[in-house]
UniProtKB/Swiss-Prot annotation:
Similarity comment: family membership: Belongs to the guanylate kinase family.
Start and end residues of each Guanylate kinase-like domain: 5-184
Name of the protein described by the UniProt record: Guanylate kinase
PANTHER family given in the database record: GUANYLATE KINASE (PTHR23117:SF13), GUANYLATE KINASE-RELATED (PTHR23117)
InterPro entries, per database record: GK/Ca_channel_bsu, Guanylate_kin-like_dom, Guanylate_kinase, Guanylate_kinase_CS, P-loop_NTPase
Keyword Nucleotide-binding on entry: yes
Gene (UniProt): gmk
Main enzyme class: transferase
Gene Ontology molecular functions: ATP binding; guanylate kinase activity
Role summary: Essential for recycling GMP and indirectly, cGMP.
HAMAP family linked: Guanylate_kinase (MF_00328)
EC number per UniProt: 2.7.4.8
Subcellular location: Cytoplasm
Highest rank taxon of the organism: Bacteria
Length: 204
């Protein structure tokens, strides 16, 4: 009955598999939603497509977006800027479409400040050893950078209490199933539908 779309925020430490889980949701059409493409100043990784995975832009263009108030949130992570364009998110939610954001932990905190009605999911690894192996498997960063990411992951995991749900990414299939269950439940939660039913009673 609700007209407004659901904002779903998928976050977690670097290397936990946010992008992989997001891709599985998209490719398998697990539930209908619009994916909000983030903007970044980092270079594309192998296989990443501009406009699909990220909008890859220069630092100058990114700072222009900041100054113009075009971003819902942004952050500088390991020397690169990441941000979420605000306009498309607001437009899609207004049209009643569910929107999926895949962002880092700092970004998720900023989104919660501006859009507290969103559903915030923390994607966590089974353990830190598994996270270390996943970062090594990427083959894109030095051991020093990986150690830094693991250290940051420890701190980020302790911030899980600020989220609505925690999903362990032991396998992509399991993580996707849990996220779908969360979305299904949120669509019928009383806090999201109560206003519609109040209107129904008043109009009868």
């Amino acid at each position: 009955m609700a007209d407004k779309g659901l904002l779903l925020v998928l976050s977690g430490p670097s290397g936990v598999g946010k992008g992989t889980v997001k891709s599985a949701i998209v490719e398998n059409k697990v539930f209908p939603f619009e994916y909000s493409v983030s903007m970044t100043t980092r270079k594309p990784r192998p296989g990443e497509v501009n406009g699909k995975d990220y909008y890859f832009v220069s630092e100058g263009r990114f700072k222009e977006a900041i100054n113009n108030g075009e971003l819902l949130e942004y952050n500088n992570y390991v020397g690169h800027y990441y941000g979420t364009p605000l306009g498309p998110v607001k437009e899609m939610l207004h049209e009643g479409k569910d929107v999926l954001l895949e962002i880092d932990v700092n970004g998720a905190q900023k989104v919660r400040e501006k859009m507290p009605d969103g559903v915030f999911i923390f994607l966590t690894p089974p353990d830190l050893h598994t996270l270390h192996l996943r970062l090594e498997h990427r083959g894109t960063e030095s051991e020093d950078v990986i150690r830094g990411r693991i250290k940051q992951a420890r701190n980020e995991i302790l911030e899980m209490e600020d989220y609505d749900y925690a999903v362990v990414n032991d396998t992509v299939a399991n993580a996707v199933d849990h996220i779908k269950a969360i979305v299904d439940a949120e669509h019928v939660s009383v806090k999201r539908v109560i206003d519609d039913y109040r209107k129904m009673v008043e109009e009868d």
